[in-house]
Amino acid sequence: EVKLLESGGGLVQPGGSLKLSCAASGFDFSGYWMSWVRQAPGKGLEWIGEINPDSSTINYTPFLKDKFIISRDNAKNTLFLQMSKVRSEDTALYFCARNWDVGFDYWGQVTTLTVSS
């Protein structure tokens, strides 16, 4: 059974940093592209970026690439999202997802980031 379990969310002050994790199990993690996606309150899903199996290619949505860093540890079957200089508009539900074809076939259970002073 494929499972993706996010962690690391919480309350962060504006300008702060946070690292989210996504622990994968039930499949060969090292063989798949993986993505991060978020959903702000009252908004639709927003793709953050993706990373290929050996971390040699990482793609970001343009306006987030300077503040978010995606990485992975295949030995630990874990995907990461390092966020810096967070602002109130970064408040959202954050999901990891396994890429498949032109979309995603499995999603994580979600972790929540709230940016507030």
From Swiss-Prot:
Q: Which SUPFAM superfamilies match?
A: Immunoglobulin
Q: Which PROSITE patterns does the entry link to?
A: IG_LIKE (PS50835)
For the keyword tRNA processing, the answer is no
Which part of the chain is the Ig-like domain?
A: 1-116
Record's signal peptide = none
Keywords, A to Z, come to: Adaptive immunity, Immunity, Immunoglobulin
In alphabetical order, the GO MF annotations are: antigen binding
The biological process GO terms on file are: immunoglobulin mediated immune response
Please, what other remarks does the record include? Answer: This chain was isolated from an Ig gamma-2a myeloma protein binding 2,6-levan.
In Swiss-Prot or TrEMBL terms, this protein is called Ig heavy chain V region UPC10
